UniProtKB/Swiss-Prot annotation:
The lineage of its organism: Bacteria, Pseudomonadati, Pseudomonadota, Gammaproteobacteria, Alteromonadales. Pathway: Cofactor biosynthesis; thiamine diphosphate biosynthesis. It comes from Shewanella piezotolerans (strain WP3 / JCM 13877). GO terms for molecular function: ATP binding; CCA tRNA nucleotidyltransferase activity; tRNA binding; tRNA-uracil-4 sulfurtransferase activity. Disulfide bonds join C346-C458. SUPFAM superfamilies: Adenine nucleotide alpha hydrolases-like (SSF52402), Rhodanese/Cell cycle control phosphatase (SSF52821), THUMP domain-like (SSF143437). Transmembrane segments: none annotated. Belongs to the ThiI family. The keyword Repeat does not apply. The gene is thiI. It is found in: Cytoplasm. This is tRNA sulfurtransferase. The active site is at C458.
Length: 484
């Protein structure tokens, strides 16, 4: 049994030197991936295809090899074939009949032949001869050249006959590492997972930069998304996962920045930090999952203001995509379930975000920050080889307990920002309520009565859940989320 790996058409269109370089890289990538399945994998490069040989005594490898080949960038499709030699056109027919006789019963069919080498016949003659024989000596429902129930695919390569047993759709794109590296800003949601996948598929080693706003549980979830993408689509090359503790930045934004500017300022601070990380790694481009108009910070005006904070190239592969299309891709690539369980925190810090930020106003707000703020969070960043995440894959993302009813001995903590709380104060008769903004809760919770149970409240339930998880990570078990 062999697999014939067909190159993505854009590779075939390259100049001879570039095509050879891409093909060599694809051969290496295939070998690197399949060797992890079994050391017996043999890969052989030819001018227009790559052959993968499966040992005759290891039929158990066929399915595993096929699944891996389907996810390697640079492959148009893969043919799973039985290999033999032939002496004549009739011999080709006899071998085809032996394989397809039972499969054709009651079905319309056509025969398609691809041929390479010198022969005293052409492809059309083989199609007619084999098709006529199969039509006459099987119980097929007849020949149908357009939209048949079954297509009998044959490939003739000099003296070898390839009877195609299965056609596997490839990923397309370019072989990994034929394009330059990128740094993807990943949050674990639908958008950042799909945008990362798009650049893996296009041939870039995609490293991951995560801005941690939600404690260990949030980080574990995002790491699982990144590891899944790497293991399934980019395993042929090493990449890095960088975690940047960004809660000090968020706290300064909430305490010092005008509410309407918070979203744009946060994104600019993230871009600055990511650009610093990219510079250290020798990477020239950042990748984000932003789509035009999807949220307030992603208007063209705001994206323009965000881009002004760095000289790094910022790539947005999803910029004109609809949300449902993004979700559909996430389902296809296996990140949908991860994304459903990971909340997006960036959108909860501003209640009246501007959709037309003015650069001078944003820069004036940013002047309120500590000069060394970005330097400090970058210094505390943790960089790991993505393979190390495998040791954390069994860690489950825990959920903070959520309640709708309150007992008299429980205390509600309103964690909303002061202006939100003042606009719509939470008052429940007979229940003690405290007001502690979420960005101060971590430092003030230790001063509270440890014998009481505290229910955290915010309008959307996102920030309250985030803070409950963080407090639980610090060892506090007397905290829940209140969702009336």
């Amino acid at each position: 049994m062999k697999f014939i790996v067909k190159l993505f058409p854009e590779i075939m269109m390259k100049s001879k030197p570039v095509r050879m370089r891409f093909t060599k890289m694809l051969e290496t990538n295939i070998r690197n991936v399949l060797k992890k399945v079994d050391e017996s994998a043999k890969v052989q490069r030819q001018w227009d295809k790559i052959m993968v040989m499966v040992p005759d005594d290891r039929p158990d490898l066929i399915e595993a090899f096929g699944e891996r080949l389907a996810c390697i960038p640079g492959i148009a499709h893969v043919l799973q074939v039985n290999v033999s030699t032939f002496e004549s056109v009739d011999d080709i027919y006899q071998q085809t009949l032996a394989v397809y006789k039972d499969q054709l019963a009651g079905k319309t069919f056509c025969v398609r032949v691809k041929r390479a080498g010198k022969h005293d016949f052409n492809s059309i003659e083989v199609e007619r001869y084999v098709g006529g024989g199969l039509n006459q000596f099987t119980e097929a429902a007849g020949v149908r050249l357009k939209n048949p129930d079954m297509t009998v695919n044959l490939e003739i390569d000099n003296e070898q006959l390839y009877l195609v047993d299965k056609r596997i759709q490839g990923l397309g794109g370019f072989p990994m590492a034929t394009q330059e590296d990128v740094l993807s800003l990943i949050s674990g949601g639908f958008d950042s997972g799909v945008s990362s996948y798009q650049f893996i598929k296009r041939g870039s080693r995609t490293h991951y930069c995560f801005f941690n706003l939600g404690g260990d549980q949030h980080e574990i979830g995002v790491k699982q998304v990144a590891y899944h993408l790497w293991q399934k689509y980019g395993e042929s090359h090493k990449v890095k996962f960088i975690s940047v503790p960004f809660d000090p930045v968020v706290q300064e934004i909430l305490e010092r920045v005008d509410n309407g500017q918070m979203g744009v300022v946060l994104k600019r601070m993230m871009m600055r930090a990511a650009a610093r990380v990219a510079d250290k790694m020798g990477i020239q481009a950042l990748v984000t999952g932003e789509a035009m108009g999807q949220v307030s910070s992603q208007t063209l005006t705001n994206l323009n203001v965000i881009d002004r904070c760095t000289e790094q190239l910022i790539l947005r592969p999803l910029i004109a995509m609809d949300k449902q299309d993004i979700i559909n891709i996430s389902r296809e690539i296996g990140t949908e379930d991860f994304a459903k369980s990971i909340p997006e925190y960036c959108g909860v810090i501003s209640q009246k975000p501007t959709v037309k930020a003015v650069l001078s106003k944003v820069e004036a707000e940013e002047a309120k920050f500590s000069d060394d703020l970005i330097d400090r969070v970058i210094q505390d960043a943790v960089i790991i080889d993505i393979k190390e995440i495998a040791t954390q894959m069994d860690t489950k993302i825990t959920e903070a307990e959520t309640v709708a009813a309150i007992s008299a001995d429980e205390v509600i903590i309103d964690v909303r920002a002061p202006e939100e709380e003042e606009k719509d104060p939470l008052e429940i008769e007979g229940i003690e309520t405290k007001t502690i903004p979420f960005y101060k809760l971590a430092t003030q919770f230790a001063d509270l009565d440890k014998d009481k149970t505290y229910l955290l409240y915010c309008d959307r339930g996102v920030m309250s859940k985030l803070q409950a998880l963080y407090l639980q990570e610090q060892g506090y078990s007397n905290v829940k989320v209140y969702r009336p």
